[in-house]
Regions:
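Feature of Fe-S/electron-transfer and energy-metabolism proteins
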Residues: 1-584
């Protein structure tokens, strides 16, 4: 404890503007210990928490503060069967509310079964989705799984795989650790150096694929140049929790080797010895895939105290999130890893200079890291040539909502909305497109007149939306757009960490206003309510600490714009000519 405390005090002393954080308790994070207790007992009994407080020498109120913040933790024994039902956009569009009502009625008098509404489970491809004792499934399988859970442990679900490998993978299908990790081996053997790797990433134009779009090579260069020779860390952000987003889950299940190689290359390039994959707890099948791959790497000597015989130490592990969409924000993620409540930090400083435990920290998304070994093997020019038109590289998209084949699709960056919907089999039942949310819940809705919009970072922004998390949600013509946007806003309201007033209060007030309109059966929002929404959106966008509050009302405003200046036309507009025809 003394060593950790001394290091923590030094950290606050040398870093401007963070003295207020000195009151936070130093020492190892208690999150993994709490996760372990709940995995063993099914909840967090008082005697276990008292023992943890004694053994870790931490005050009980600190532990209670963690438990009250994170939604995964339970302080009461669960029922024999926990039936979690997703209520967010992709499931909402597939009659999720009706299925939820049916399940509640069916099990209302069953003492063994608890039906709980939850935020997005990351299974939008099987919407409406449920999780029975944490085992994910489509709602059509709920009753069978409930019966199975009454009788025995359901066991772990298998991760979803593909019959054919993704086209981006440079390694032969079925190859093992010995044939993979070629770029990492070359780097550790001295055949490549960090400067060349970073230069190649800069030349390629690779940008962060988690939503921010920050140039990857520039980020790596910043972390590498910050405090050379000091302790540094690296984190893969796999806390994919935004409604409509499930592409990272598929990448982790099918290409764990590319994600881990990208992370390890990043660690070696910036000078970090320790790295983690921070994964949401709902992704247990993918967590097991990652742990198996890490064990294979350790057995082969690729990671450890003497990685690939280079004399360099590279250690990597998995950190399981205790829940909460806010943890996708990089500084909230770091707060969680340090064992605090996952509340975003004020920035600057940024993680590249002041990250985990106050040290320079490289943070990249799953897809970004998976792209790194591909680019370094095939070259920056090859990557640039893969895009459509002026765009660069490949892009994974998760497509859900009113489409025939919800799934993950790998396409050239710059593929149009229309083309992506066509890959997903077109709109369900041959209907016309009414609206599209092209970049996940954070992105603004676009109308059927924008189906030929190329999906890349800059073009999307110019069109008034964003590429975001790579989640394209399709709404058929006739869908109640205000209800859909209100559903999105409810998600942000529920997931707000509550730290800043604009986000906490603004999202609640706006949701109450919209809910009143929907419950009244009104066909128009009206000028007064519209102006109130616009005022709240401006205040939240300009004054919220993190991206959640800044974007929470954007989708609602975009729907109002699609419906006209008075807020009328609350249903998806009729198609106008060829641009709104069904895509098959």
């Amino acid at each position: 404890m003394t060593e950790v405390s001394d290091r923590t005090e030094t950290r606050f002393r040398r870093t401007p503007g963070v003295e207020a954080r000195a009151g936070k308790f130093p020492g190892p994070s208690l999150i993994p210990s709490l996760n372990a207790i709940q995995a063993r007992r099914g909840w967090l009994p008082r005697e276990e928490l008292e023992e943890l407080a004694r053994s870790a020498r931490r005050p009980r109120y600190e532990i209670e503060g963690l438990i009250s913040f994170y939604p995964h933790f339970r302080t009461e024994p669960p029922t024999k069967v926990s039936l979690h039902v997703c209520h967010d956009l992709a499931c909402f569009l597939r009659d999720g509310e009706a299925r939820l009502a049916e399940l509640r009625e069916r099990y209302a008098d069953d003492a063994d079964v608890e039906v709980v509404e939850v935020s997005c489970l990351g299974r939008c491809d099987i919407a409406p989705a449920v999780a029975v004792n944490e085992r994910p499934a489509p709602v059509s399988e709920a009753d069978v799984l409930v019966q199975g859970a009454r009788e025995s442990d359901l066991g772990q679900a298998a991760p979803r795989t593909r019959a054919e490998p993704w086209a981006n993978d440079p390694y032969a299908s079925g190859s093992g650790v010995g044939e993979r990790y070629a770029v990492l081996r070359a780097l550790l053997a001295g055949e490549l150096d960090a400067e060349r790797i970073i230069a190649t990433l800069k030349d390629s134009g690779l940008r962060g694929m988690g939503g921010a779009g920050f140039p990857t090579g520039q980020k790596w260069d910043l972390v590498r140049r910050t405090e050379p020779g000091s302790v540094k860390y690296a984190v893969c952000n796999a806390d994919e929790s935004e409604p409509g987003t499930f592409k990272d889950r598929q990448i982790l299940a099918t290409q764990p080797h590319l994600v881990l190689e990208g992370l390890l290359i990043g660690m070696a390039a910036v000078g970090a010895e320790e790295g983690w994959i921070f994964i949401r707890h709902e992704y247990a099948p993918e967590e097991h895939v990652l742990r198996a791959e890490i064990e294979a790497l350790r057995a082969a000597g690729v990671v450890g105290a003497d990685a690939c015989g280079s004399g360099r130490r590279l250690e990597v592990d998995v950190f399981v999130s205790p829940g909460g969409y806010i943890l996708g924000e990089e500084t909230a993620l770091l707060e969680c890893m340090e064992g605090h409540r996952g509340e975003p930090r004020n920035k600057p400083p940024f993680p590249g200079t002041y990250g985990l435990h106050g040290r320079p920290t490289l943070i990249n998304s799953v897809e970004t890291l998976a792209d790194v070994p591909v680019i370094l093997q095939r070259g920056a020019q090859w990557w640039a040539d893969q895009g459509a038109g002026e765009s660069v590289g490949w892009k994974f998209f998760a497509v859900s909502g009113h489409v025939e084949r919800p799934d993950v699709y790998l396409v050239p960056m710059g593929t149009t909305v229309r083309q992506l919907i066509a890959l997903a089999g077109g709109v369900t039942g041959g209907a016309a497109v009414g609206a599209v949310q092209p970049g996940g819940a954070s992105s603004n809705f676009i109308g059927p007149d924008q189906l030929d919009l190329p999906l890349d970072f800059d073009t999307a922004v110019k069109a008034g939306t964003m590429l975001g998390s790579g989640a394209l949600v399709v709404l058929a013509e006739g869908t109640d757009l205000l209800a859909a946007a209100t559903n999105v806003l409810r998600f942000f309201r529920n997931e707000s960490c509550g730290k800043c007033v604009p986000c906490r209060v603004g999202s609640t007030k706006a949701h109450e206003l919209l809910r009143e309109v929907l419950e009244s059966g009104a066909t128009a929002l009206g000028d007064a309510r519209r102006q109130r929404i616009l005022q709240l959106e401006e205040v939240m966008r300009k004054t919220s600490i993190c991206g959640l509050g800044q974007v929470a009302l954007g989708p609602v405003v975009s729907v109002l714009n699609l419906g006209g200046s008075t807020g009328g036309g609350l249903q998806a507009p009729k198609s106008d000519g060829a641009s709104g025809q069904p895509v098959r």
